[in-house]
């Protein structure tokens, strides 16, 4: 009976992993076609969340199974074959990509959240965003000293939230290998905030 249950669990895990099998789209005559489809799917929303801001809305990518899969594969292609202990995602859209990447790699996922959203003892770092000021936090036991970490988020703008995340990772003793973003707004020069961390982005505006 126990063996049967274990067999069922293994079968269930196998079926679940199939849903994250490499997308044929991701391996097409390289990603130029894929990237263009992703670029077209990202929707500009003017004056959100404040007047004068053009918000990059990724929900059309998330709602399309092929495009969502392709976007995850972009991150995975940067991570496979490397020694990575944890994937860190930034509240909130970084969770959507980071947790899927961590699952596929078989490593832990660490959420960095806005202050007041985590229940246990935290480290805190402040940041400036193009539309305000805020603080981010991470559980003090989320990353062990010496662990190799990749930061994943949907968008790099001014670099404030990402820089705060990098501070938290390093406070914990983690080694930040790379910061990866689906979208980068190059005119805001956010990657300067992350120096000397290598920055990778797939869709540049």
Sequence positions of predicted segments:
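PRPP-associated nucleotide enzymes
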Residues: 2-4, 8, 12-205
């Amino acid at each position: 009976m126990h063996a049967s249950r274990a067999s069922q669990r293994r079968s269930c895990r196998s079926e679940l992993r199939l849903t994250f099998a490499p997308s044929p789209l991701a391996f097409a005559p390289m990603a130029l076609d894929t990237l263009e489809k992703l670029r077209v799917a990202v929707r500009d929303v003017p004056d959100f969340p404040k007047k004068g801001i053009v918000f990059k809305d990724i929900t059309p990518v998330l709602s399309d199974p092929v495009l969502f899969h392709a976007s995850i594969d972009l991150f995975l292609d940067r991570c496979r074959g490397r020694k990575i202990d944890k994937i860190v995602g930034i509240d909130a859209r970084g969770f959507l990509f980071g947790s899927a990447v961590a699952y596929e790699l078989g490593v832990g996922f660490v959420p960095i959240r806005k202050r007041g959203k985590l229940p246990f003892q935290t480290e805190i770092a402040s940041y400036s965003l193009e539309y305000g000021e805020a603080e981010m936090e991470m559980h003090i036991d989320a990353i062990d000293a010496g662990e190799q970490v990749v930061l994943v988020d949907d968008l790099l703008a001014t670099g404030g939230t990402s820089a705060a995340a990098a501070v938290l990772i390093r406070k914990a003793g983690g080694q930040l290998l790379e910061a990866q973003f689906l979208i980068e707004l190059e005119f805001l020069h956010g990657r300067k905030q992350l120096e000397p961390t290598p920055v990778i982005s797939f869709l540049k505006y």
